[in-house]
């Protein structure tokens, strides 16, 4: 919505400029008398740039630029009808593709008033010579590639009314000389890389109506001198690094229609002087550090259309007076500390209000039946509060409602049938238990999130009618029965499918042949049997597969190697069997980052080159986001932490970094040597090969894994010495060599000395453990432990379920589990953040 408002004021300023140019053009009527010096200057100017198609198109429109025609008739050129002097050059979108030279012939046009070079692909610095064109009233260099500082000489243009330098790559400080432009009406410097403070001299521009300095790197406080701009209509300072309190003088700007300070570090209270800004239609203070309550009755802003104070620390009761503003269309109050119940009985905004976003506050009580008064409501978000009771039946009167998010409350009862007509329904983390019966034949939901409720029985048949479904999360419920094959009805559109943590039985239907958009599939923690669906080979967009903790009985799906984007594969705790390696499978998992196939019945050996093509574990690719991320039309992005921000899904643990790499082959029957190619995986953080039958010595190439943090090779048949080279792995915080046939000295080194004595148990020939085992009193920990204690040790690294943040609700799971039940849970907490100690064997994430 903020983007929409931003475009609104940009569009308004463009209209002002367009009308100004139109009036000027109409005033310059025939006859035209082009002066030779003006014509020659224009031709020389054109000669400074390569000829290209855009010039050709321009010439066809109003005639060619050449000596045989009147230059006053040339495209983009306007002359004074008396003197023949060129007074306007308006050639946007001509893609000049060159520098604007300091000695350009453009600067011979001394009587130029209007200069519009919008989107001409100009680069280099803005020539200081521009300041010599003293008649200029408009300079528009919008959307080019100009670099360097804004020339101070522009401050000499005392006739200038419009200065538009936005969307370039300008650096340096805003020159204080701009304060000399006493006739300036429009100043647009947004979307550059300007630094420093906003100069006080900007407050001298008494005629200014539009000031946009958004999306730069400006620092310091908002100067109080801006309060002198009594004609200002638009004030946009978003996306900078401004600090301190907003000066009370801003309340002097009584003509202000648009005020946006979004995404800075402003703090303190809202000045009480803001009560003077009664003409505001757009009021945005979001993503700052404002505190306290609103110091005035909000209904005084009787022209307000868009109100956004989200992502601050405002407190106090829900500001009901906002609902008395008849023109209000959007209210964004999420991520604050508002308290109390909400009520809509006394509202004047029932016919206008479209967006009501109240998520992540401290609101409580029932959802009022008076919600039905908001007849035009399209989006309602009251997630992450303490609302109780049932969804009121009056919600059926909101016939325009498209997006509903009630997640993370204490709501209960049945889901009204009318909600199937929505586009987005997010009801996760409540206590809903059933669905109202409906005869509805059609449903248009694209995003449906019912996770973490108390639903039971078979999947609602209405889900089978969602032919456009893109996101479905039914996880953490009590659904039972078979997974219906009718999910093929939306297989062509589904991207995220999470049915994990239910009681589904039967087979996983092999119905994914048309699921070419599928990104994430999670059916973990059910009772599914049978084969692994081979139709997944058609899902070329697939990034995550999690079938953990089922009863699937099949051979290893090596054909998944062909999926170009598969990052996470979790087959843990099933009945998979047979060898991992097939001689016809030669591609390798090139994109795999996390694999967990532990606690199955895999057997056989791995050839030395088995990991040779696992490229994503060898080198990191440059990625924009730090965390695995997915974007949805209705939901915000989900990196930084794996919780829903707008209309998505919550998770129990925090995000996982994109650079995390892990392999867990533990609890199988794999034998032979540890493959040599494992040493190529230099980005690997976790390696668990425990509980197999690997033989020979511990390979020295493991010392090549310089980012390794966890190494568990316990409960194998490894012999020989522990390589001294492993002591050089400075990130290695946990290792386990117990229950092997190792001998010789334990390497000296800080990482080894910090391990627990149990990490070396049952290796009869090991010695040098005096310092490590001093606290236990077992200086020679080589005897076989009782079976139950041994089992506890070997399960220490069942590290399943570290999550993967794929986007507006993707499903994930993988890499956590028994870290939290063992002495090493501190390591996991440090890496992934603290939340409730709620999932001991797995973690649910919705990407």
From Swiss-Prot:
GO terms for cellular component: plasma membrane. Its main location: membrane. Residues 820-847 are cytoplasmic. The chain crosses the membrane at residues 799-819. The keyword Glycoprotein applies. It is found in: Cell membrane. One of its GO terms (biological process) is meristem maintenance. Keywords: Cell membrane, Glycoprotein, Leucine-rich repeat, Membrane, Repeat, Signal, Transmembrane, Transmembrane helix. Residues 28-798 are extracellular. Glycans are attached at residues 52, 66, 103, 132, 180, 210, 228, 263, 276, 289, 346, 386, 437, 489, 503, 601, 688, 704, 736. Residues 1-27 form the signal peptide. It is a single-pass type I membrane protein. It comes from the Eukaryota. SMART domains: LRR_SD22 (SM00365), LRR_TYP (SM00369). InterPro entries: Leu-rich_rpt (IPR001611), Leu-rich_rpt_typical-subtyp (IPR003591), LRR_dom_sf (IPR032675), LRR_N_plant-typ (IPR013210), LRR_R13L4/SHOC2-like (IPR055414), Plant_LRR-RLKs (IPR050647). LRR repeats lie at residues 109-133, 135-157, 158-181, 183-205, 206-229, 231-253, 254-277, 279-301, 302-325, 326-350, 351-374, 375-398, 400-422, 424-442, 443-466, 467-491, 492-514, 516-539, 541-562, 563-587, 589-613, 657-681, 682-704, 705-729, 731-754. Involved in the perception of CLV3 and CLV3-like peptides, that act as extracellular signals regulating meristems maintenance. Belongs to the RLP family. This is Receptor-like protein 12. It comes from Arabidopsis thaliana.
